[in-house]
Each structure stands twice: as C-alpha cells, then as structure tokens.
Amino acid sequence: MDAMQEAPWVVTFDPKDTLEEKLKKAAHVKPSPAQLNWMEKEFIGFVHYSPNTFNHVQWGNGTEKKSDYHPAKLDVPQWCRVCSRAGMKMMIFTAKHHDGFCQWNTKTTDFSSETILGGEDVMESLQKGCEDNEMGLGVYLSPWDMHQRGKGLWPKPEYNQYFLAQLRELLTNYGRVDEVWFDG
C-alpha cells in the first residue's frame, strides 16, 4: 500500500466491502491540514469581471471589440476592501473566462486589459489589494479560449503551449496564489 492510501483523508474500499463496512471506513476519515486550512476560509469572494460586464451578457464568444471594455474608474483595491470588510478571507478572480480576454499584462495575446487600460494590470492591482487586506488570492483561468479558437489555434499542440504560458505568467508574476480554478 502506498503512502497516499495510508493517509487519514483517503478511504480505500475493497470491491468486496459491504455497505456497512464502507460506512464504517468513511466515518473515520480525517481531513489533511491543508484541507482544514481551506475549509476554515469559509467565506470566499468570486469576482467575475470582464468586457461582458459592460455587454450585459454572462459569456462572451471571443469576438468582443476592445471598445466593449470601458471602465470609467477601475478601483480594484476597493473590491478587496469591500470583500475583506464583509468577512471574506480570499478572492478568486476570473483572470480569463471563455471569451479569452486576459485581465493581466500577458505576453501571449493583445486581447487583454493591458492594451485597453494603458498598461494597467488588473491582476497586479488585485494581488496588491488582497495582500493589503490580508486576503488569499485565487485565480480562475479558463482553458476554453473562444478568441484563440477563432485564430486557428484550437486543437493544435500550440494551444497547449499558449495556455501553459498564461498559467505560468499568473503563477509566477503575482506572488502567492492560493487557489487555481480551471473551467471549460
């Protein structure tokens, strides 16, 4: 039996186990320290902000015009202050949703907030706001990128490199990232 199977947060069932035996095993599961730490966060903010905030649609399709994204006064640290005062211990930010619009200064595409906001890095502002408010930072990064599909990069291996480059940027340029969400 390997170490993972012996861990107190793992239950291993034998195919011959009865329901009663399975219930008895499951009743003795203990969460790992990392799992306990995550559960103690209890209240986490999930911020979904993108060009579609201004289009009144839930999802974009990757063909949005840069002119669709027009925040009059973007105050990302204010988001963090409000969430912190509400008792949230972490914020998860949609750095890129399915439309492919990147909310950080990326080298992978010009379909980003950087090209529209004159170099302002929304992700950097969020990271600083979370740090200033003693909150954890989570990143939502959609592997499904409808904007790149339109450019012919969809099922090709090049897309994997493109996506991994984005993930690398987010995990190395913004300090500690406590959680990563993939969706798509």
Outline where the language-model segments fall.
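Mature catalytic domains of secreted/periplasmic carbohydrate-active enzymes
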Residues: 1-184
